[in-house]
Amino acid sequence: MARTFTSIVELQGAMQQCCTVAIQNACEILLAELQRLIRSEFYDQYTPTMYNRTYQFLESATKEMVTDLCGRVFMDADRMNYLEPHWTGEVQLEAANNSVHGGILVNGGRYWDSFMEYCNANALNILKQELRKQGLNVR
C-alpha cells in the first residue's frame, strides 16, 4: 500500500520504524540459528552421567535491541548460575565452544565459531529480506 508523506521527518520516521522491525526480525532469525547450533553442536554431542542438565547454557542465548537501528544476538553469561563457584557463565561459554562438557572433552562442534560463520555468510541477506518484507526496496 502506497503512503504519502508531507515532510522529510514523516518519511524518516516511517523508514526508521520499518528498519527497526526488520532488525528485530533478523535478530530473531539469527537467535533461532544460534539455539539450533547449540543443540546440535553441544547438547546432541554428549549425554551427561555425573550431572543433570539445567539448560541454562541454551537459555543464555539472547537478543536485544541496542538502539532503534542496532540489534545484537549474544550469549549472556550472567544468565548462568552453576553450583560450582569456579564454573561461571564465562567459563561455560568458553568451554562449550571448545567441546568441553562438565569438564570432559568430547568430539563436538564449536557452536560460536559455527554461528559466526553462519552470520558472516547469511546475516546481511537475512536483513535485506526482512527490510523487503517491510516494503523497502533493498539491493
Indicate residue ranges for each PLM-predicted region.
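Secondary-structure transition/turn motif
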Residues: F74-Y82
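Short, Lys/Arg-rich flexible segments
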Residues: M1-F74, Q92-R139
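A short, structured beta-strand/loop element
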Residues: Y82-T88, Q92
